[in-house]
Design a protein with these regions (language model features):
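Short coil-to-beta transition motif at edge beta-strands of beta-rich domains
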Residues: 4-17
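A short, polar/charged loop/turn motif at coil->beta-strand junctions and beta-hairpin connectors
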Residues: 7-9, 33, 70-72
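Short beta-strand or tight-loop elements
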Residues: 9-11, 21-23, 74
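Compositionally biased, intrinsically disordered low-complexity regions
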Residues: 12, 24-27, 50, 91, ...
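Compact nucleic-acid interaction/catalytic patches
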Residues: 16-17, 21-64
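C-terminal terminal-subdomain/extension
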Residues: 58-121
């Protein structure tokens, strides 16, 4: 998966999590110098396929609106995914959270410490 050089907070990117296609992730926090990024994941991949792991609804908070037609259902993990730049692939253009869901996204972002969480090597 191609690595992206300029990652922006508030945009969707494809996250490589071991699956063949990856999953859309919304960046809520970043530290370019430390190469650390925190993302909120959605349930389906770019093609709209729901991952098997996401069928387990524990520890998930549903959003009220899908991000776009191809995404069947979106959610916010209570502990968003922390990753390095190499784990972030192609930017997904045209994906946006519904305005009514922004409060949930901001709530997740506010739970992140100012210096960001620790990242295992």
């Amino acid at each position: 998966m191609a690595e992206i050089k300029n990652i922006e907070v508030g945009k969707f990117y494809l996250i490589h999590d071991g699956s063949k296609t990856g999953h859309p992730g919304f960046v809520v926090w970043k530290d370019d110098n430390a190469n650390r990024y925190l993302l909120v994941l959605t349930e389906s991949d770019k093609e709209g396929n729901v991952s098997k792991r996401s069928a387990d609804k524990r520890h998930l908070t549903d959003l009220d609106y899908p991000t776009e037609d191809r995404i069947v259902k979106s959610y916010i993990k209570k502990r968003p995914m922390l990753c390095k730049r190499k784990d972030i692939g192609i930017c997904l253009l045209g994906m946006k959270f519904h305005p009514n869901d922004y409060e949930k996204v901001k709530f997740v972002a506010k739970q992140i410490p100012v210096n960001g969480p620790s990242l295992r090597k």
